[in-house]
Structure formats: C-alpha cells, structure tokens
C-alpha cells in the first residue's frame, strides 16, 4: 500500500473508534475499524486506492482528499450499510476497459453524501446495488473532449436508489441500465452528452432536475413507465440535439416540464411500442425549439393535453410522408393558432391544423433543411399557400385548441420566462 501525502504536521493519526488508534495509511485506519465505527482521518491528501468492505462511517470533515494517483478506481465500496461523507475523490486511472472511476459501489443501504469527485474517468459506477442514497455529490470529470469522457454516474442492475441534489458537469452520460424504481431528483446536469439516459430501465422517476447544454437532455430507450415531471430541459442543440427522446418506449408520463431551446423538443421513434400503454404529455411548456415535436414515422398512442407550444420554428414534424393524425391532441395551446373564440370560453371555435406546403421539401428530404428559414424556401411556401401546385397534406389537427396557455404555463406566472431560460 502506497504511503499517503498529508498536509498535517505531526505523525499521529487520529481515528474515532472506541478510542484513538495509530495507523500508517488511510486503508489501515479503515481495516482496523469495527463495524459501525466512525473513521475521521486528519486533514490531508491520501494517495491511495481505498477498499471499504464493512459498514463503517468514513467522514472527511477535517478536509480529506483521496487521490488515486492516476491508477485504478479511487474508492471501492463493497459492503452494505456504510456511509461516506465530506470527501474529495480525485485522479482515477484512465482505462475505459476497466471502468476506472472515482467511486465504485456494490452493496445496499449505503449513504454517499457531500462528496466531490474530480478529474476521474467515470464518476460513480454502481453495480447490483439497491436502496442506496447519493446526495449532494459534485462530479466534474475534467475538461476532456466529449469522446474522451466517462459517464458521470453509471447504474447497472440496481433498483430503488435515490440520486438527489447532485451537481454534474462536463461528463458524458448519466446512464441507467436494467434498473427500476430509482428516483432522480433535484440534480443539475450540464454540458454532457446524454443528461440522463435510460436503457431497458423501467419505472424510474425523474423530477425537478435542471439539464442544460447537453447533446440530449433525457432519452428513454426500450424503457417503460418512466415518469418525468417538473424538469427544466434546456439548450440541447446540434444536429441531433433532443430535449426529451423516446425509442420504442411505452407508458411514459411527461408532466409539467419546461422543454426550451432545443433542436428538437420531443423526439418519438416508434413509441409507444406497446399500444396498450400510451405515452402521456401534459402541462409541458415546449418553447423556442427548432422543432417542437418530431415523430420519426406515422404512429399512434401518444396523448398531448394542456401543453403550450410557443415560438417553435416548426411545431410538429413527421419524417417521410406520414402524419400525426392518429395521435391524441386535446386542449393544447399553439401560439400560431389563427382561429377565434366567439363564445369566449377559452377554446378555439375552429380546429388548429398544420398543413405541409413547401415545408414538406425538407421534411421528406432532410438535407433541404439547410434552406429552412431562408428567403427562397419562405417565398416558395408563400406561393404554395396562395396557389398550391398540389394538394397540401394535413399533418395534424386539434379540434379544441386553447386560446391561451394553461394557467400554470403563462410566462408571466412562471418562475422564469422561456426566454430567460435560453440565456
């Protein structure tokens, strides 16, 4: 075991057990601790790769940094009922094949809180671990190009965990594989690839998170019964930028989210896969996106109600020659609705309809989207609307659109306006 480097003067190491114990390394302190003991090392930087295999409390409140020295995973936790808190973990190895991380967890009912993980390949790697709590963890894996980063948090066959109040920046993905009933709440995730990515992971809840400047905000791939509510999903730009995406996923409940400033606000690639379990989108603000909702094909089983579609360059896009006529549209607000409300009941008296005129050029030939927003395509669209060369295709229809956004989604009543979210 390599010796540690400490900023503390003196040679006596204190540990809170039944009484003070002298030890040569942090690993020695941990190994000497009885089950349930609290280990409080002196302040300093300990250059070691630590293994915790019994249920202690490791508290770095004095100012403890554990440095992996660029080798392997910094801390390996293979036990149940342990607590790690008030620590800094840094400088893991850099081998993707070994998944070198700041912290590896394999166990149940552990609590990891108030920990900073920096300059590591992966942040936290969690395997076959249930009922753990990860709270107030800061993960900054380093200013690497995106393709050289590891995942901030990787969850593998792990259920009933809580991830709360964490701050993640400049990592690759927060990815959940084959895991159920996890709660991801009140986290800040910035400048990654997938903010949160579910793979074959069912019945998880994502709420009150702020996900900004990622390539993709939240993506569900073969993941059913996911709940997304009260999240801010902002500024997923680039050619493949997606706010919320689905791939063959069913039974999602997407409520009260702000999906603002993305290339594609919502992306649906045949979802729901199970026709008996529709996806529900209710009370969302879908604003200032390049495309509000993109359907990869003509599909059915998605129900949209009480949403506000505001200043999207294109409200709805269906690739190829399909339509969104089989989807459910009920009581949404569309800011480009040109109808009227003669009886003043708040509901438009004529349907909201989207027809494809010149737009179908870039919808059917994606490379033509280069000209979208330009004078030539705008002029062609105007002429098509004035005197169509051929019958335009009806893309979608809502029979009872709202004249104004639902009360909760009125910009003046929101904590932040949609424009402020873009800044």
Q: What are the functions of these language-model segments?
A:
Residues 1-12:
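Bacterial N-terminal signal peptides that target proteins for export
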Residues 21-51:
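Acidic Gly/Asp/Thr-rich repetitive segments characteristic of extracellular carbohydrate-active
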Residues 41, 60-65, 87, 115:
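Extracellular beta-strand-rich, repetitive "passenger/adhesive" scaffolds
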Residues 46-57, 66-110, 121-129, 155:
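Extracellular beta-strand-rich solenoid/capping regions of secreted or surface-exposed proteins
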Residues 68-76, 96-104, 119-125, 141, ...:
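Extracellular beta-strand/beta-solenoid scaffold signature
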Residues 237-239, 243, 252, 265-274, ...:
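Functionally critical loop-and-helix segments that line ligand-binding/catalytic clefts
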């Amino acid at each position: 075991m390599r010796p540690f480097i400490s900023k503390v003067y003196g040679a006596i190491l204190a540990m809170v057990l039944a009484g003070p114990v002298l030890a040569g390394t942090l690993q020695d302190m941990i190994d000497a601790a009885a089950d349930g003991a609290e280990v409080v090392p002196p302040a300093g930087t300990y250059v070691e790769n630590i293994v915790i295999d019994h249920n202690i409390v490791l508290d770095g409140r004095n100012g403890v940094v554990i440095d992996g020295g660029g080798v392997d995973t910094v801390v390996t936790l293979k036990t149940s009922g342990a607590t790690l808190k008030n620590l800094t973990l840094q400088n893991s190895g850099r081998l993707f094949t070994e998944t070198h991380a700041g912290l590896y967890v394999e166990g149940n009912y552990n609590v990891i809180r108030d920990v900073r993980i920096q300059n590591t390949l992966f942040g936290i790697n969690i395997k076959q671990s249930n009922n753990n709590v990860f709270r107030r963890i800061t993960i900054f894996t380093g200013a690497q190009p995106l393709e050289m980063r590891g995942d901030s948090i990787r969850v593998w066959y792990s259920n009933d965990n809580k991830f709360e109040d964490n701050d993640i920046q400049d990592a690759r993905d927060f990815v959940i594989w084959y895991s159920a009933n996890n709660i991801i709440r009140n986290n800040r995730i910035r400048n990654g690839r997938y903010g949160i990515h579910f793979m074959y992971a069912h019945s998880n809840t994502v709420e009150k998170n702020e996900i900004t400047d990622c390539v993709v905000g939240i993506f569900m791939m073969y993941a059913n019964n996911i709940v997304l509510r009260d999240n801010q999903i902002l500024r997923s730009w680039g050619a493949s930028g997606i706010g919320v995406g689905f791939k063959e996923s069913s039974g999602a409940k997407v409520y009260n989210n702000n999906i603002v400033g993305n290339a594609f606000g919502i992306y649906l690639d045949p979802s729901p896969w199970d026709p008996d379990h529709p996806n529900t989108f209710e009370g969302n603000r879908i604003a200032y996106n390049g495309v509000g909702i993109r359907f990869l094909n003509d599909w059915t089983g998605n129900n949209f109600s009480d949403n506000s579609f505001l200043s999207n360059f294109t409200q709805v896009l269906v690739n190829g020659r399909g339509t969104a006529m089989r989807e459910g549209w009920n009581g949404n607000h569309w800011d480009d609705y040109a109808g009227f409300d003669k009886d003043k009941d708040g509901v438009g008296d004529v349907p909201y309809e989207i027809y494809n005129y010149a737009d179908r050029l870039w919808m059917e030939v994606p490379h033509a989207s280069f000209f979208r927003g330009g004078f030539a395509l705008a002029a062609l669209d105007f002429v098509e609307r004035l005197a169509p060369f051929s019958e335009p295709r009806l893309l979608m229809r809502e029979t009872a659109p709202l004249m104004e956004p639902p009360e909760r989604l009125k910009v003046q009543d929101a904590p932040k306006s949609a424009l402020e979210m873009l800044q």
